[in-house]
C-alpha cells in the first residue's frame, strides 16, 4: 500500500524483545506450509517477482528512503542523498545481474534474517560492483545496519531497470529539484530551458556533446533522450532491438561528456546517468574553466 510498509511475522517460535527483526518472514506461507526464504524470485510462478512502478509510486518510495536516511538530521541532506545513490546503485546492479528463472534476487530481506547479516550481504554486493566500476563511488556505505534494512524494505519489490525510462527521469528529476533547491539550487537549470536548448541544437548520434559545468547532468540526459528518440525513428524496438540500442548506447558511452567541480553533484550526475542507462563514465569531477 502506498505510504505504508507491511511486515509478516512468524509466531511459531518465541522471540525476545531484542530479537523482533528475526521474527520477520519474507511473505505469508502458502497452504499453511513453511515460509519461503526469499519473497522476490525471477519469473517463478506462485511467488513474487519485482515489478515496474508508476511515477507517483516511485517518487513516494524515493522520498521514504531519503527520510529514513536523513533521520531527522542524523545526516546532512547531501550526505543522505549520497547514501541513497549507493544503495540504488546496488539495487540496479542486482537487477541486471545474470540469473535463471526461479532464482531469487539478492537485494531483499530474507526470512528470519538479522539486520547485521542483511547489511553484510548488501555491503558485499556494493563492494563487488564498486570494484568493477570505480568511476562511480569510491567510499563505503556508511549508514548503520538497521537504517540500511529499512531502505532495502522500501526498494526490494521495485524493478527499477524495467520501470519506464521517462517515469524514472521525471521521478528523480522532481525529487532532486525539490530536495536540492535549498542548498544546491544553482546546479539545476530549469528543464524547460534544457529542453529548448537541446531541441535547438538537435544533437546527432555521431556528434560530441560536452557540458563543462554539467551540474546534475540535465543537458547530458536530455541530449541522450533526444538521440534515443532519433533511434525510435530509424529502428523498430521489437524487430531491430540490437540496432536500436547500439544507436544510442554508442553515443552515451563515446560521445557524451560532462565536467562538474562539486564532487557531491558529480556523484548525483553519474547516478542520474546510471538510472538513465549509462554514459556515467564520461562525467568527471574537475573545474571545467580551469584551463580557460
What are the language-model segments listed below?
Residues 39-61:
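An acidic intrinsically disordered interaction segment
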Residues 67, 77-97:
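Core catalytic lobe of class I
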Residues 70-84, 142, 161-166:
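Structural motif
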Residues 89, 93-178:
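Long recognition/docking surfaces used for binding and targeting
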